[in-house]
Amino acid sequence: MTSVVELFASFAVTITAAPLARSWMLRQGCVDVPNYRSSHTVPTPRGGGVACLLGLCGALVVAATNARDVPWALVAASIALSLVGYADDQTDLSSGFRLAAQVLVGATMGVTLGGGWLIPVAAFVATAVVNMVNFMDGINGITSLSMTVWGAAAWIVGVLHDVRGLQLVGVAVVGCSLGFLPWNAPSARLFLGDVGSYLFGGLVASGLLLGLSGGAPLMPLVAPLVIYAADTSAALVRRVVRGEPLLHAHREHVYQRLVSTLGITHLAASTGVAVLSAVATVTWLWCDTVISVPVTALIVVLYLASPRLLSASHLWSVDVPKGLPR
């Protein structure tokens, strides 16, 4: 029952705070203006992840009031990452500073879990996941829907294996994601910004580390991220092969090509990513490895090949409008 209240608190605070965050960002001039590498066509305020940060605080208040086990150090680290993201939204921090901050906060996560080998592991996990979520937050609804899948998986794993901190992180992620979704899809009135993608990245990293340290199986927590990992890795490999800067913004992700080339709507592409992630997750939660491995591999291959497959099948024609404006 407590999880339900935490879920409602994070959802209610996020959806209520979103218009306030939008007004604040507009006053601050924190607006994304479309350019040649954007997937949106309308200037839109970013930094809406502040509402999710407040939603997380709402869940924490409920948890503390009910004497729940709260992984305070990991949550604090996630909040610290979101503040780095907020600063980047406002002032455009250098890539070197952002990377150093991510590694430092990740290492701190490892220290709080006992140190030793967990320090480099946590530093890597936090940095990788934060950047992965940030890179993939490029069309309407993709982060909210995908993080809802991950949060649900985290809660289920936490319940099945009695990792209570993971239960809290899971429901908070679901509540914040669903609370933000109406403001970001089908057409966006507000973007998460780095403050939001860094927050979700930090919470996902925290969940992975909680599962690892708590003896829970990791694959059900990793499975919701397979599409993110595959898409990000494929985009980076393409840029390495061409000798292009890795950290420069681009429109080479699969989901971006589905929208810009095939004219699939933002929400349809985002839903497709979330559904595929959910299918992979379900197989790792309730099926044997002999089923989970090939199903996950097939999902990854089909997703990466989807622009070519859909184009060849002529299911989408060039006359289809190029997605909904962001």
PLM regions: where:
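Cytosolic, membrane-interface loops and tails of multi-pass inner-membrane proteins
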Residues: 19-45, 234-267, 317-324
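Short alpha-helical linear motifs
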Residues: 98, 121-124, 169, 246-248, ...
